[in-house]
A protein has these predicted regions:
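Conserved activation segment of eukaryotic-like protein kinases, specifically the C-terminal portion
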Residues: 1-15
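Repeat-solenoid scaffold signature
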Residues: 13-28, 137-139
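Conserved C-lobe activation region of Hanks-type protein kinase-like domains
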Residues: 20-26, 32-91
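Terminal C-lobe "cap" of eukaryotic-type protein kinase domains
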Residues: 95-125
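Regulatory extensions appended to serine/threonine kinase catalytic cores
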Residues: 113-119, 123-211, 218
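Asparagine-centered strand-capping/turn motif at beta-strand->loop junctions
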Residues: 233-237
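Short, solvent-exposed loop/linker segments at beta-strand-coil boundaries, enriched for Pro/Gly
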Residues: 239-242
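C-terminal boundary/linker segments immediately following FHA domains
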Residues: 244-297
Length: 297
């Protein structure tokens, strides 16, 4: 017995290979998909209403992925909607496994990638303020900038959160200074607890490398919510941390021994001194000169 057919990789069901880390990665993706959406990635309406043979064919990957952006022939009207229960990052990881990874085993999302994406997703949820609901949902504004609970349609107050961004630079040749080329949002973190520990996987991509430079996940800084509802920045590990208050140009280091720094919307938090990038020797062809920062929203 190699496993339950519903969770087995197609190449296992076809008896092409023995179980390995790639088939395990596929099975994990199916289980996570089922936990979130209450369904199988290849069992849409055209299979759900079909024969047992069609269901077996679906487990073999002979039907399109339910959330395939290029075709909607196998969509499900019975599963929980993807945009309600998963972040964009999780959606992309599922697509990698069930579209590209269906035939190319090397493309399948790893357990570590899923673990980090699930960690990030767990920090993006908020609790509905409707006392008759109190369900959790991914904090995401609609076109009217409202935070509507998908379970009861209650309009919730806008939460405080950190928006992490990556900033790219190119050089002004004549002034020997840098100008902003691109700001790309990467992660969000909802500040919902009395103590919000932000881990280093939000600060750097070093955690995903499979080499000697990999870093274990640990708390990088903390944001505490006081009884008066205000938020305060704390640097418990004395990591490199700077803040630029809204409507100011001054960068202030935040050190372990310092008093907590009150945070307001639009304050900027940096994880290295941003002023050092003004002095780098780059030219107009340079790309990838990058640092990450967070905006209090």
């Amino acid at each position: 017995v190699l496993g339950t057919s519903r969770y087995m990789a197609p190449e296992i069901m076809n008896k092409q290979v023995s179980p390995d880390i790639f088939t395990d990665a596929y099975s994990l993706a199916v289980i996570l998909f089922e936990l979130l959406r209450v369904g199988h990635p290849y069992v849409g309406d055209m299979v759900e209403d079909g024969t047992p043979e069609q269901q077996t064919q679906a487990y073999l990957g002979l039907y399109p992925y339910e959330d395939d952006p290029d075709t909607d022939v196998n969509r499900s009207s019975q599963m929980l909607p993807m945009d309600v229960v998963a972040t964009n990052a999780l959606r992309e990881l599922f697509a990698r496994t069930f579209i590209q990874g269906k035939d190319d085993r090397m493309m399948r999302t790893t357990a570590k990638e899923f673990a980090l994406a699930c960690l990030e997703a767990s920090n993006r949820v908020m609790k509905c303020s409707n006392p008759e609901c109190k369900c959790w949902f991914i904090a995401k504004a609609n076109a009217k900038k409202q935070y509507v609970c998908p379970w009861c349609d209650n309009i919730n107050d806008r939460p405080h959160f950190l928006q992490f961004k990556d900033r790219y630079y190119v050089s002004k040749i004549q002034k020997k200074e840098n100008e902003v080329f691109s700001d790309k949002p990467v992660y969000s973190f909802v500040l919902r607890n009395e103590k919000n520990d932000i881990t280093n996987n939000y600060i750097s991509n070093m955690y995903i490398k499979r080499d000697k430079f990999s870093k274990p996940i640990d708390v990088y800084f903390t944001i505490r919510k006081a009884k008066d509802g205000k938020f305060y920045l704390i640097n418990p590990g004395n990591n490199e941390l700077y803040i630029r208050k809204n409507k100011t140009e001054k960068y202030m280091p935040v050190i372990k021994e310092a008093d907590p720094v009150e945070l307001e919307r639009h304050d900027l938090i940096f994880f290295e001194d941003p002023q050092k990038y003004i002095k780098i020797d780059i030219d107009e062809h340079s790309r990838g000169v990058l640092f990450r920062y967070a905006v209090v929203m």
